[in-house]
From Swiss-Prot:
GO CC terms: cortical actin cytoskeleton; cytosol; nucleoplasm; nucleus; plasma membrane
Species of origin: Homo sapiens (Human)
Function: Necessary for abscisic acid (ABA) binding on the cell membrane and activation of the ABA signaling pathway in granulocytes.
Name under which the protein is recorded: LanC-like protein 2
GO BP annotations listed: carbohydrate metabolic process; negative regulation of DNA-templated transcription; peptide modification; positive regulation of abscisic acid-activated signaling pathway
Amino acid sequence: MGETMSKRLKLHLGGEAEMEERAFVNPFPDYEAAAGALLASGAAEETGCVRPPATTDEPGLPFHQDGKIIHNFIRRIQTKIKDLLQQMEEGLKTADPHDCSAYTGWTGIALLYLQLYRVTCDQTYLLRSLDYVKRTLRNLNGRRVTFLCGDAGPLAVGAVIYHKLRSDCESQECVTKLLQLQRSVVCQESDLPDELLYGRAGYLYALLYLNTEIGPGTVCESAIKEVVNAIIESGKTLSREERKTERCPLLYQWHRKQYVGAAHGMAGIYYMLMQPAAKVDQETLTEMVKPSIDYVRHKKFRSGNYPSSLSNETDRLVHWCHGAPGVIHMLMQAYKVFKEEKYLKEAMECSDVIWQRGLLRKGYGICHGTAGNGYSFLSLYRLTQDKKYLYRACKFAEWCLDYGAHGCRIPDRPYSLFEGMAGAIHFLSDVLGPETSRFPAFELDSSKRD
């Protein structure tokens, strides 16, 4: 008891120093202060009263009243994207030729160019994407099965690119090869984990991605159901072993640790199970997934952040992979599925933590960097239409416009999608169209688009 108390006291006293070590102090005023200053400056001179500006724009803010990004900010982002793309292409000349993953390798670069094609409709980006994915499809090794770190990523992205190019034969070949991985995924005797980066949830994402991007029925419902059932059975088994069936019906671990976050933990797994495309039945969602989410919710720190694992009492990490920026996506999806205000309220609390502590010294990337944290604001804006979150996303984008100027650590794979420059470019391109933005290799399209 005494040890726990001293641990918590130490955490409380060391909180600010810890934050400064891991994140920069956010230099931007929050939306209320920025919008308030604009209202004050737009007050009528003759009466001295405060009123909104008479124009349809909100001068000084990076967007108009309808949420469309202003032309000047669009131009700044487009210029920076062009500049960063040149740097990235130069840097990739010395990248690991054998890394085919979406996380740190060539599939991630293919995904970036696919995104730029989506945003601009410029065919040259689609062809660039094809160049990169062809490179990966020649080097599949069969060792891993997930979208982010295994063969499922190159195959799923390849299928989508070929589909967009109307090369249906090549697209179907990729789908067929992807489905051949399924046997090893659903085998309960295998030591495959359930998490997103290396486990079943990561393979499930690949199947859902195909049905979202190419069309329903690309992967048959029975194949998806088989993977979903394997994930659920695995969670029930561990919950039983840990005697947590009542409190947390679906419990998961990775390397013997019960992680919480999006990358290796329960937030990422529950998030995938709640996707409409996964077609998990309502009874399972209500009886198994919902109480498990609530169990994780109760592990929240007083700050509003979440631990990296159930056994960790240290409030340190504010990353998509560990902490509030990953858990927020689970909470938003829970709000959509269960329609309970508590989930939205806690997602908003996560957003406040990310705003305060999300400009990371680790860099600008997606997994554990500022761009990944910025995506949480875009997602919350799409859900609520509250301009506060669009403003926050734009401010994190503004930070990324000064890429390299803050003295951040240089990641091991500095040009990759999840650790480096490609991820920041992806985020910046999504800020141009917030309504259709999505976190790559994680969020799925809720609308049909080609």
